[in-house]
Amino acid sequence: MQARLNRLTDAPVGVVGAGRLGGALAAALRAEGIPVEGPMGRGEVPAGCQAILLCVPDSETEAAAQTVAGAAPFVGHVSGATPLAALEPATRRGAEGFGLHPLQTFAPAPASVELAGAGCAVAGSSPAALALARELALVLGMEPFEIDDDGRAAYHAAASMASNFLLALEAAAERVAGAAGLDEEEARALLAPLVRTTVENWIALGPERALTGPVARGDEQTVRAQRAAVEAAAPDLLPVFDSLLSETRSLAGRRVPA
């Protein structure tokens, strides 16, 4: 028999995992008038909850599901890459499983995390579980979209490329800027407006139309000078430069003349 979905205000949502994501989700739910138990430490079991959210590292999801098995009719995880099968210890005890992955970064920054307007990947082992995941996302101001288990790895890889790899690229740019006499803080402050505008142009125009710079202009002399500068300043970054140069040339080749 499938679990019945009650109104979110009828019973608490339990949050297991007191890290950045668990704390942020617990605070955001409370701010929307949803009763919350937690965030609790790993190994603790919220009582009297309609749903329990496991905000733990991916590798600990199955163990956490085992710990809370039988404690709530709905048990969910907040991992982008982990399949719902990881919740099997809880679903074997009668719970419905769901996934709720905010497509947002939760860095240890002083600014509060902005969930409103962010995408949220949802999944459910039953219509009721999927409905709960959607409702939680909407209550928090996010835009829910379905990702099935087969698509999770590709979805999460895209998220990592757009967020984590972007930081690796900016760190590389800071290093190369050092050869121009700029320290890391100076480089970050000076490059930040360029990065923001580039991302905003990508959002508004798409990658092909947003592309500017020497590759887009076909200025090979400048590209050669840039490559030589990278080789001199940080030779270990040359494979990164060459790989990105190749991708940028492919992107430029797809541009439609204005």
Model-inferred region functions:
Residues L25, E32, S112-A204:
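Internal alpha-helical scaffold of NAD(P)-dependent oxidoreductase catalytic cores
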Residues T9-P12, A72, G117:
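Phosphate-coordination loops involved in phosphoryl transfer and adenosine-cofactor binding
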Residues A27, R42-A111:
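Rossmann-like NAD(P)(H) cofactor-binding subdomain of soluble oxidoreductases
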Residues M1-G48:
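NAD(P)+-binding Rossmann beta1-loop-alpha1 motif at the extreme N-terminus of oxidoreductases
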Residues Q2, R7, A189-A258:
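NAD(P)-dependent Rossmann-like dehydrogenase/reductase catalytic/cofactor-binding core
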